[in-house]
Amino acid sequence: MALKLMIQGTASSVGKSLLVAAFCRIFKQDGYRVAPFKSQNMALNSYITDEGLEIGRAQAMQAEAAGVKPSYHMNPILLKPSSDKKSQVVLRGKVYKNMSAAEYHQFKPQLLKFIKEDFDFLASQNDIVVIEGAGSPAEINLRDRDVVNMGMAEMVNAPVLLVGDIDKGGVFASIAGTLLLLKENERNRIEGVLINKFRGDIEILKPGLEMLENIVHKKVLGVVPYMDVHIDEEDGATERFYRRSTEGDIEIAVINLPHISNFTDFEPLAKVPGVKLRYVNKGERIGDCDVVIIPGTKNTIGDLQALKGYRLDKEIFEMRKKGKFIVGICGGYQILGKVIKDPGRIESTTSEIEGLGLLDVETVIENEKTTTQIKAVIRNNLPSILSPLRNIAVEGYEIHMGKSRILGDCQPFSVITHRNGEKIEVYDGCISDDGKVFGTYIHGIFENREFVREFINIVRKSKGLSPIEEIIDYKEFKEREYDKLADIVRKSIDMKKVYEIMERYKD
């Protein structure tokens, strides 16, 4: 069986996902076969595997760092919040049902079998499995049915490293408090502490580390600096929404919907020279920009109502009159249509709602969820303004619970040629007559270098700007960032001690 290492944190957003990715890349660099694992993930940012199964985006990112293909075994349970009180439960990559928090808490013991089987499968195929916890292990009201923190560590007999975030302040109290609330056998399983996101002079911190070790009787195995790495990270979502790209000739505004999903779709745009990417958050106006993007959402009807409530629909209509580019991805594509129908009340109590009406499309929400990896070709009869996009091949994935039907003479945007490796020919998306508004179900479309370059150059041409000749290859860029992440963490942590700890827990 494989060696095991589990990363738990004193709270959410302390950097567990990124550290798991770092360990995955370090072990890969050291010649080991390694896989990430998180028994239960709660996230709206998801990924579709080669088999057409849905997992958390963080585990797909960690698999990339490990140099292996993402698999549903790496994240057997995915919870996708659809409201403040309910989540869609995705079990082994497929939708199981919607549950309230109370219902799910009662259901958790039935999931142990699936979790153990999937972990054992990864352990049989790899030399090392790096496990990520969720939130904090010290949620004492949830401990009796825990399947993701200490319950998980005990199930597979994994050693635990506890991570604290010093950037927010209070790191010593959070570490000591977490250990205080754990049972003795759980404290004994924690083999070391990691201080994450440190800025400043390490010499000033050292006395505090010594005092902490004397108080909690745990060794600090490393202090990891605040890292400027550009990697898809779920915990970085809030920070990302308030971050602004540097000044540029082209400004792109992404509407931060209440239930925005797969926000990583737009990260490649931020890496394009001359592009300023920003998110329009609650209470903010769209303002002056060249492109408005309405992203995917886990609750299309609810987020359309919110968009109208914020009066952003009025601004979008003004953008349309000014001839700006308006793009919808997945749920955003549905929002751009004329009407969204939900006869089964799957998303809300509203059976029908008017869309923005910028595309001649009708969407019906259905129980069956489409989850596929796809290959597509942009259609060759796009309006002249978008002619540089014609016949460009793209790859991406679909995640949606509705089907959209083009009304009237509106033209499709692309032709899907492959779904999960099987050849097909299905139209996708829709485009306005003048080419200034288009929608697609293809997540990840902006990770296709040629498509992004030509689209940005179309926008640049509309402003009288010269074209950009080349942009970075996003996949190569991410590989460099994984290596950079691993180098920083390797230099900051006692890796010899980490290997010794894993060997002691070897089955």
Swiss-Prot record:
Record-level GO BP terms:
cobalamin biosynthetic process
Full protein name? Cobyric acid synthase
Transit peptide among the record's keywords?
Answer: no
Q: Describe the function of this protein.
A: Catalyzes amidations at positions B, D, E, and G on adenosylcobyrinic A,C-diamide. NH(2) groups are provided by glutamine, and one molecule of ATP is hydrogenolyzed for each amidation.
What GO terms are given for molecular function?
A: ABC-type vitamin B12 transporter activity; catalytic activity
Q: Which UniProt keywords apply?
A: Cobalamin biosynthesis, Glutamine amidotransferase
The family note in this entry says: Belongs to the CobB/CobQ family. CobQ subfamily.
Instruction: State whether keyword Magnesium applies.
Output: no
Q: Which domain of life is it from?
A: Bacteria
Q: Where is the GATase cobBQ-type domain?
A: 249-451
Mind telling me which Pfam families this protein's record contains?
A: CbiA, GATase_3
InterPro entries (alphabetical): Class_I_gatase-like, CobQ/CobB/MinD/ParA_Nub-bd_dom, CobQ_GATase1, CobQ_N, CobQ_synth, GATase_3, P-loop_NTPase
Active-site residues from the entry: 330, 443
Q: Which gene encodes it?
A: cobQ
Question: Which pathway does the protein contribute to?
Answer: Cofactor biosynthesis; adenosylcobalamin biosynthesis
